[in-house]
Amino acid sequence: MKTQFAILMIAVVLMQMLVQTEGGILGKIWEGVKSLIGKRGLKKLDQLDDTFDSDLSDADVKLLREMFK
């Protein structure tokens, strides 16, 4: 029982160390990938920018007013 508890505590400590350093390790890996691909390859990485069009045309406003009457 004592051995299992000791192994559990060592595993918890090692997991905490991994979680604390994970951001640094993954950040360095991501920087390496970005430098390999270059800025041009990562320029349009987020495709959701096209879906959020903040400009509403007059026809859009008219349709919204009709819908919410």
Curated annotation (Swiss-Prot):
Keywords per UniProt: Amidation, Antimicrobial, Cleavage on pair of basic residues, Fungicide, Membrane, Secreted, Signal, Target cell membrane, Target membrane
UniProt signal peptide: 1-23
Protein's UniProt keywords contain Signal: yes
Tree of life domain: Eukaryota
Disulphide connectivity of cysteines: none
Keyword Ubl conjugation recorded: no
Annotated positions of the Isoleucine amide modification: I37
GO cellular component: extracellular region; membrane; other organism cell membrane
GO BP terms, alphabetized: defense response to fungus; killing of cells of another organism
Propeptide residue interval(s): 41-69
Cellular compartment(s): Secreted; Target cell membrane
Organs and tissues of expression: Expressed by the venom gland.
Primary role: Amphipathic peptide with antimicrobial activity. Shows antifungal activity with MIC values ranging from 25 to 200 uM. Does not show antifungal activity against Candida glabrata (ATCC90030) and Candida parapsilosis (ATCC22019) (MIC>400 uM).
Family: Belongs to the non-disulfide-bridged peptide (NDBP) superfamily. Short antimicrobial peptide (group 4) family.
Protein name per the record: Amphipathic peptide OcyC2
